[in-house]
Amino acid sequence: MALVGSRVELDADEDIFEDALETISRSPSDMATSGFHFVPCDTKRTSRQLGAPAVGRAEGSSAKVDLKSGLEECAAALNLFLSNRFKDALELLRPWAKESMYHALGYSTIVVLQAVMTFEQQDIQNGISAMKDALQTCQKYRKKCTVVESFSSLLSRGSLEQLSEEEMHAEICYAECLLQKAALTFVQDENMINFIKGGLKIRTSYQIYKECLSILHVIQKNKEEQHFFYEFEGGVKLGTGAFNLMLSLLPARIIRLLEFIGFSGNRDLGLLQLREGASGSSMRSPLCCLTILAFHTYISLILGTGEVNVAEAESLLAPFLQQFPNGSLILFYHARIELLKGNAEKAQETFRKCISVQEEWKQFHHLCYWELMWIYIYQQNWMQAYYYSDLLCKESKWSKATYVFLKAAILSMLPEEEVAVTKENVVSLFRQVDGLKQRIAGKSLPTEKFAVRKARRYSPSSGVPGKLVLPALEMMYVWNGFSIVGKRKDLSENLLVTVEKAEEALQNQNFTDYSVDDECLVKLLKGCCLKNLQRPLQAELCFNHVLESEKLLKYDHYLVPFTLFELAFLYKSQGEIDKAIKVLETARNNYKDYSLESRLHFRIQAALHLWKKPSSD
């Protein structure tokens, strides 16, 4: 179906729904006047003067901004962002945010990023308001068509070639804005209305990208006649590549459902499209690079197997490091890559530099605090880990329940006399967790739900609190930290010593309701340490102990499917691929309704994809 033909159906769904909702929704607040920026640029245009407005422009003027100026100034804005000049980027785009589609996209992205990073309700409202204005600006440039024209486009693809360059770019900008507005809609409130609104926006954005890909194929033969063909191509590659990549990560059962309603995702195709976009010289080429970097340095670890393409990540980052040696975002990725290589000390140094190079955007500091906290956990430097967890509790609003639980978990690893120095009450901290959980798109965050469940052991109703065993290492496992530690034999050996001490302590304690669960947790953690140390037979014994205790578990039922996942990778490392796949499928198909189920299904999907199992798709 051609784009102009499908728009009547797609936009009608959303517009009618949203118009009906406007009367019962809160009025959006005024657009934010400050924020931070993350929009595309051409990193090769280093000679261009950044931040210089076009001659003769003034805010409030009714003059039209041409496509060339919009593209150039959006590119300049990203250069400003990557140079830590966040407010300058905002001010460059602000005057024409209601006249130019690219200024609108860039400006609203700044405000949306502020909302996502701060998680303040007022910032979220500002972001939604800004993005709504941006959508209206983009709409002005989209092709206008009658119902008759829309119907005729169903019969002929010739209408694709009738779009002007400006109209084609308007579709790309509109799709990008829709996707961002959908993300904010999900975090705005937990009611079902917002969930449906967000879903409609994603559906519309996805359809626009599909049609833009069709347009790209049609105009390929005349690309020399298109002044901004490569810019349009870059937008298509970024959008379709990111959609394919993200959808492919979803568990198989969700993919089957989404395919039924018209979505599809292919990881290899998504990465190929992003790589093609990254290799070009369009304004969005850097964003294609940064998307791949995010996949390799974060997504593959948290929602994947932990097997990261570090070589590609380093290659992609190298030009950015040369051009923006003090850019916060670039330094952050650099530190992540060093950590994934096992260079924890170098990563610490780089994260600290990332904090020191700018004060304008404190949210970057919070990301670094999070990373530094985990590195100190890997090193078992508990006081330093506590320091950064405490900073997160005080300064960041992203996930208070997770931060407080982690702070309490870290303190639990310390002797009582050292905890006393901090003047913290560990039991009190654990009891705060339940009241701090939040909901997004009507759902509690899985990691927060996990923290709440674990913290219940300290509930006043339970009488004498039953102390958690190695809670910081359990959370480290949940966040796939053992994949990182596995690069360092010294860290793995030190962790094994700590786990074995906990194992011995459990054997000397009286039996309680928690004894089997605690013992199985320790065996899982011990097995992971042994696996990292290339001691597969001993690791397998630990994993089998957990599996044999399945019917005795009372609380931590997640331990069995997660242990099966680890056992599968143990078999894979020994060349028993068919056996490994069978174990993964057992974990996927035979267990449900346990903590962090969706996270494990993401990881199973990633593993089956890597192991080339057709039935897993």
Curated annotation (Swiss-Prot):
Q: Which key words are in the record? A: Lipid metabolism, Repeat, TPR repeat
Top-level taxon of origin: Eukaryota
Q: State the TPR repeat positions.
A: 328-361, 561-594
* Disulfide-bond pairs as recorded: none
The GO annotation for biological process reads: cholesterol homeostasis; lipid metabolic process; negative regulation of cholesterol storage; regulation of cholesterol efflux; regulation of cholesterol metabolic process
User: Which SUPFAM superfamilies does the record match to this protein?
Assistant: TPR-like
Tell me which InterPro entries the record gives: Iml2/TPR_39, TPR-like_helical_dom_sf
A Pfam family assignment: Iml2-TPR_39
Q: Which family does it belong to?
A: Belongs to the TTC39 family.
Q: Which PANTHER family match?
A: TETRATRICOPEPTIDE REPEAT PROTEIN 39 FAMILY MEMBER, TETRATRICOPEPTIDE REPEAT PROTEIN 39B
Chain's role = Regulates high density lipoprotein (HDL) cholesterol metabolism by promoting the ubiquitination and degradation of the oxysterols receptors LXR (NR1H2 and NR1H3).
Name of protein: Tetratricopeptide repeat protein 39B
Q: What is the lineage of its organism?
A: Eukaryota, Metazoa, Chordata, Craniata, Vertebrata
